[in-house]
Amino acid sequence: MIWLNSYLFHLSLICFYYHNCILTYAHLYIKTRKCTIEASYAQQKSVFDTSTPLPLNHEGLGLSFSSIFLHNSFMNILQKIFTDYYEEIKYTLHPRNSEMENIDKMINCGNPAFGGAMYGCPHCGNLKFVPFRCHSRFCPTCGNKYSMERSTSMSFKLINVQHRHCVFTIDENLRDFFLKDRSLLNCLFHSVTSVVSRMFFKLNKSKNFTPGFLMVLHTFGRDLKWNPHIHCLISEGGYSDDGFWRNVKHFNYTYLRNAFRTALLNELESCLGSSFKKIKAKCYSDHKSGFYVYAKPNKCDPKNVIKYIGRYLGRPVIATSRIDKYDGELVTFHYNRHEDEKYVVETIPAMDFIKRLIRHIPEKHFKMIRYGGLYARHRSIDSKLHRTIHKSKHHFYRSFNQWRTAILSSFGYDPLLCSECSHQMEFLELYYNHQRVSLEELYEKAMSKSRGKRSSA
C-alpha cells in the first residue's frame, strides 16, 4: 500500500511538471507569433496612413479599425423588422422570457460592439474584422448553422439501413391547447414513441424487435402559422434482444393513424382532466380513421443522410431569402403550399408577421429533438450494429460545420483569404466592447484559473 501511494505521488508530480511545460510553451508560442505578425505589419506600414497608429499597437484602435466597424455594421431584413418594432413588441405583445431573450440575441447578432476577432494579412497589411454571432436558433444565420450541427450529430447515431420519414399531425382543434400550455408538447413525443415501439413489438412479441427512430418537433407550417407536428425518421427494421436484425419494409399506416390518435388523446386527458372529455369525443367523431400520418415519398438513403436530415428535419422557422419585401409597415414573404406545392405570396402587417414568428420560439432548455428505441439506449449488444457514418469519420464531418469551412462549402469562397493579395490571413486579437483583449490577457486568466483550482484542491 505504501509503494502504491508513493507511485501515485510521483506520477502526480510528473503530470504537474508536464502540465506547466505545455502552458509555458503555449505562452511562448503566442508571444512569438504575435511578434512575428507585428514585425510583418511594421514592414508593410506604408499601406497605412502615417498619421494613423498601426492596428497592433497598444495605444488605441486607430482610424482603420473604425472604418472596419462601419463596414461590418449592417443588418439583415429580419433584424431590421424586429429593430423597428422593438418597443411595440416589448410593451404590447408581452412576450415570454425566452422570446425576448432570443429577439435580443438575434437583433444584436453580428454587431461589432459585442466583440469579434481581428484577422490581418501579413503580406499586405489588410485587416478583416469578424464579429461574434448570437448562437440563437431563432436567428436565420445562427439557426441555420445550428441545424447543420444538429443534422451532423443526428446522422452519427443512425444505423446503416434505409429509414422511413413519417409525419405525425394533429387535429386543428387541438393546436390551441399546445399554444396555451407548452408543456403539453411533451405529449406528442410520448405518443409517437409508444406507437412506433408498439408497432415493432407486434411483429414478434417474444423477440421484442426494437427500431431506431429520432423525432423532431416542428411547431410551424409553411405559412408560419401555429401547427405542431412531429417528423419521425424510423429505421426500416428492428433489433431483437438476442441480437437478431429483422428488416421491415411494410409499415401499417392504418394502425399508426388510429394508435397515434388514441395515444395522444389519452395523454392529453391525463394532463387536462375531465374538462377535455368533450374535445376528445369530438376528435374521435371527426377523425374516425385516426389522425393524419403520412410518409415522405423519398426515403432517407444512408449515403445522403446528413443532407436529408438537414433539408427536412433541421431547418429554422424562416430563411431571409423567403422575405421578399419590407416597407416599414408591411412584410411580403412567399412559400410553396403544402397541399399542392403552389407558389403563394403573402403580404401582412409587420406586427402580425412578428407574432407568427415569435410563437415558434421554444421555452429555454426544451428539447425539440429526441431519440427513441435503439437510438435512445446504450447497451453493449447494440454496439454490434454498423452505423451510417463510422466513428473514425466523425471529426472529418464535424469540420464542415466550422464557420470557415461552412462558408467555403456553401458560398464557394474562403473568408480568411485576403481580398487584396489572396494570401492566408492570420488571427491577431479579440475585441470586446470596442476594446482589445490580448492573447496574453487570456493566457493569464487561464493560468490564474488553473492555479485557483490547484490551490483549492
Regions found by a protein language model. Give the residues of each.
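Beta->alpha loop/short-helix hinge microenvironment recognizer with preference
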Residues: 15-17, 21-39, 45-457
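Short polybasic linear motifs
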Residues: 8
